[in-house]
Amino acid sequence: VNAVESYLRKRAIAAPWRLECGPIEGVECAVVIPALAERAGILGTLRSLAANPRAELARALVVVVVNNRAPGVARAEDIAGNQETLDLLRGLMRDGGAAEGRDVMEAGLRLACIDASSSGFELPAKGGVGLARRIGLDAALRVLHQAGAGEAAVLLSTDADTLVEPNYLEAVRRHYARPEAWAACVDYAHRLDGADAEVAAVLAYETHLRCHVLGLRLANSPYAYATVGSTIVCSARAYAAAGGMNRRQAGEDFYFLQQLAKTGRVEAIHATTVHPAPRASHRVPFGTGRWVQDRLDGRQELVTYHPEGYRVLGALLSLVHERPDAAPEWILAELARASRPAAEFLERQEFAECWNKLRQNSPNLRVFLAQFHRWFDAFKTLKLLHGLRDSGFPLQPLWSAVRTLLEQAEQEPPAFPWQTLAGDREAQTALLRHLRQLERQKTR
């Protein structure tokens, strides 16, 4: 029994949700899209997928998970909208659908859907996008296994407000032509169209995300990637090894990527880009939509982590990599010279006990470092940054923090108008494009 078969037997979610689809012969990958109140936008996402070559579409099953919680928890208008989405999808699958969506099916899109919306099929009260993704990915994994795709099958996660490029499926397939390919994040770039206030907010949000990744890279963290749910790709084997998609209402992408990084390697796919929408949303407690909404409501300042926090993180990781033979007390004492709060944080995490145990149980340096980063994972990294935020390195204005990190990376754009950046949308856009390009260069 391989890892995928074991996962499907022991951990995969099934009842009461059922995959509605046509023939599955020849399917090698699946694109899973959770959809909540997306009747107006889902066709745009499906059309962007349908613009991929017919030969690529023949290998791919597109699974839309129409989901909401029960009445009284979910909004009545969202439930009604979801029923319209289900009607649309079922019509497309049955006979090509209404005129507005017929082009999608004529292009060769292989469509499937899951009803996690109707009475008796709703998500539980604490369910959310994480569970919706899990339901879809588990169902897709089962279909891929039945189709004979095996552990090399590929699972792609995106969103119903996200547009993909015409080479999306090909770029992912080419990446997974390498047998060792485990997990990856496709390049992303939020669309900078729409209402001015929303565009301004998403400009700042994506800059914050890329600022954070730049700081993590400067610190040499193995968790230096953006956690954007619409970008995640993994092999069937990796999905099973990671224990499936995290079920959280938000942050599911963060925890799932962390597990993928602990069990293998998270790479970058630069050959194509996905384009999330710059829209506000109340549906999740954090993430792009919530950040944009809070910014519009005046509850979100333009701030990000203090650059010194990444310097302290880098000091810790340097000590670990340069002196793996050292006693934990020496590591803590040296770290305290850079930041006493960081050393105290590690003490609260029982660092000394963990360090000694890792040294005893690791046969070589490679295993030791891998085990250390499984312990000091993305979540502990974030907890350290939050601890430093609360003990001497408070959140900093976004634009000045970006400048500091770019200076440290020796990647500051030439002759850039930093002094007037806060009120200059054109310059902010240019800065974001610079950060996007820098991220591509650093992960090639």
Q: Across the structure, where does each feature detected by a protein language model lie?
A:
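Acidic donor-binding/catalytic loop of UDP-sugar-dependent glycosyltransferases
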Residues: D138, G150-H175
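A conserved hydrophobic helix/loop-capping motif in glycosyltransferases and polysaccharide synthases
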Residues: C29-E38, N52, V65-N68
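Active-site-proximal specificity loops/subdomain of glycosyltransferases
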Residues: L8-K10, P71-A152
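Acidic donor-binding loop at a coil-to-helix junction in glycosyltransferase catalytic cores
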Residues: R248-Y255
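Conserved donor NDP-sugar-binding/catalytic core segment of glycosyltransferases
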Residues: L163-L203
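Short, acidic, metal-binding catalytic loop of nucleotide-sugar glycosyltransferases
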Residues: C21-E25, T45-R59, N68-G72, G81-D95
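A recurrent flexible, glycine/aromatic-enriched loop bordering the glycosyltransferase active site
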Residues: V213-V233
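Terminal low-complexity segments of carbohydrate-biosynthetic enzymes
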Residues: V1-S6, Q293-R444
